[in-house]
């Protein structure tokens, strides 16, 4: 809490809670991650609180209700997935399946205003057949992630997976990485396009460069606006007017527009 007050006093408007296993925060001290989020959201001067990567099982109905009731909480959910195929998830020893994940995404989208869902997807895990890979592709298309980090499985000596049979070749993994990236990039473009026409608060994080200034909405959509004003470190209402490959373009609202 003292660190939050210190950050607020220094003018920071957004904090991001991160950790190697963020979802397990507080288990050793008798509290829960949502307690830390609530504390951060109610710290004077802190206008935004964002979370790092989360395990899907952490987001119970109770926890979602608490988060949805915090105005300063940023509705960007980076939900661990790894694969969109149940057979692969089972070999990975994941404790959720695609049905659970799908239903969780639906609950998030019904409870939060304009949330974004991001994730990591691995291809080429030992034993991944072409059919399993295609199931993962289809699931990624279905969910429509705002952004995905795609990566190929690599052997780590001493792990259970390293000893599994049916290791894929480098060529197979590279090919699947390329295919998955193509699918998720299309989802990314669709998500950015869906933001056009919306009015969002944007925290500007970079100084002027050729008259363009860059920032992020609460759901972590990157937005670029043209302005002669110094916006870095401040939050402004922006109407999103267009979408590029990896960011949106917007216009600052005038005081009159904000009052309407």
What are these regions (language model features)?
Residues 17, 51, 79, 120, ...:
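Conserved, mostly hydrophobic/aromatic
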Residues 128, 142-145:
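Contiguous mid-protein beta-loop-alpha structural module that forms a pocket-lining wall or clamp
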Residues 26-41, 45, 92, 155-186:
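Radical SAM enzyme [4Fe-4S]-AdoMet core and its adjacent flexible, acidic
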Residues 163-260:
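Terminal RNA-binding accessory module
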């Amino acid at each position: 809490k003292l660190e939050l007050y210190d950050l607020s006093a220094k003018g920071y408007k957004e904090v991001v809670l991160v950790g190697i296993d963020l979802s397990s925060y507080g288990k050793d001290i008798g509290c829960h991650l949502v307690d830390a989020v609530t504390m951060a959201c109610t710290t004077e001067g802190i206008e935004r609180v964002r979370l790092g990567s989360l395990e899907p099982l952490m987001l119970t109905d109770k926890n979602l209700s608490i988060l949805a009731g915090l105005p300063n909480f940023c509705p960007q959910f980076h939900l661990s997935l790894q694969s969109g195929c149940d057979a692969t998830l089972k070999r990975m020893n994941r404790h959720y399946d695609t049905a659970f994940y799908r239903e969780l995404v639906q609950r998030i989208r019904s409870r939060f205003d304009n949330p974004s869902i991001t994730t990591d997807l691995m291809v080429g895990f030992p034993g991944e057949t072409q059919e399993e890979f295609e199931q993962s592709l289809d699931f990624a298309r279905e969910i429509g992630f705002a952004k995905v980090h795609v990566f190929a499985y690599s052997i780590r000596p001493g792990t259970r997976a390293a000893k599994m049979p049916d290791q894929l070749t480098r060529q197979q993994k590279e090919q699947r990485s390329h295919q998955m990236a193509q699918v998720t990039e299309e989802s990314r473009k669709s998500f950015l396009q869906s933001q056009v026409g919306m009015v969002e608060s944007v925290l500007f994080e970079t100084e002027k460069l050729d008259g363009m200034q860059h920032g992020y909405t609460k759901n972590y959509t990157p937005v670029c606006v043209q302005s002669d004003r110094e916006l870095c470190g401040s939050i402004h209402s922006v109407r999103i007017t267009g979408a590029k490959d990896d960011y949106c373009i917007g216009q600052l609202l005038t005081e009159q527009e904000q009052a309407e």
